[in-house]
């Protein structure tokens, strides 16, 4: 019933105005699914390869589509994704592009869910998923690779951990975003928005921490539940020539570990992503030993949703959480493999958007399907609120 009869590929815009790949999948009995690939700005060295959209589409049409149309069932996600791997023939999707692969993979999953008449999260997670919903991490102050002349730390993330519902959490993050703007206005600091909709003021990191504390305290008073915050340090982007660069100041790897540990203690951080360089497994292990009982130390560039790198982290005790970005690894099956390995070894999966996004909502369903404790998908902006509003709908209809 779910035999795939047609795969269509086209070029569309992402949120940065760059071309990306969209796929549509149809089945023999009318099932339909559409998926669109996101794109990152601060990309890990070990990610699957994203090809220019037109090249990725041409290669996928030539190599992948003939292996799928009339050959594979949308309900067999592993079969779809194995066909994509077979068509590509490399270990990093450098032939057809991870952007084409992930778009087709997501579209096939949606087509299968459509045939079943079930929400995507039920198709992906089955009837036995837990009852908890992910807490959205809202990016409210941004810098690094997402905004020029702003903070060195790439993301300051609101985390409404005490919210009684997803909807309450989503609106709390939007309130924090608005309160940050008010705090900046009071200080006479102008700010545009970065790639992910966060404010990108020309302030130093210490002032950003002050503003986060004040904004969160104000919103906590209004909503009546606990809001903490976290960071995406994007350590690999700060690391060069053996040291971490914060403007004119530098820190050695040992000093960086101590600095992050101090931040966790001082600000009661609930989440710290990529605090160190993407190859510093030992530094991640040391930091996890120091503060891993109090916060999530999450590997993004460290692991790139890759089971081989995650297994190395598990063996070394590096981090206690993994960021899950399907386009980093190329298919939903590969993302699920990373999630399964993580949860089996006590690592929390955190599902994430990319800085260059579309209105695709797959990651909202993936986060719910896999009982992820957090989802990173911004606080405001149409391509971000598409996922947030989908989370609200999922919770309301569950």
From Swiss-Prot:
Its EC number is 4.2.1.11. Its main location: cytoplasm. The active site is at residues 196, 325. It is an enzyme of class 4 (lyase). It is found in: Cytoplasm; Secreted; Cell surface. Gene3D superfamilies: Enolase-like C-terminal domain, Enolase-like, N-terminal domain. Keywords: Cytoplasm, Glycolysis, Lyase, Magnesium, Metal-binding, Secreted. GO terms for biological process: glycolytic process. The keyword Metal-binding applies. Mg(2+) binds at residues 232, 273, 300. It catalyses: (2R)-2-phosphoglycerate = phosphoenolpyruvate + H2O. Binds a second Mg(2+) ion via substrate during catalysis. The keyword Magnesium applies. Catalyzes the reversible conversion of 2-phosphoglycerate (2-PG) into phosphoenolpyruvate (PEP). It is essential for the degradation of carbohydrates via glycolysis. Belongs to the enolase family. This is Enolase. It comes from Natronomonas pharaonis (strain ATCC 35678 / DSM 2160 / CIP 103997 / JCM 8858 / NBRC 14720 / NCIMB 2260 / Gabara). The lineage of its organism: Archaea, Methanobacteriati, Methanobacteriota, Stenosarchaea group, Halobacteria. The gene is eno.
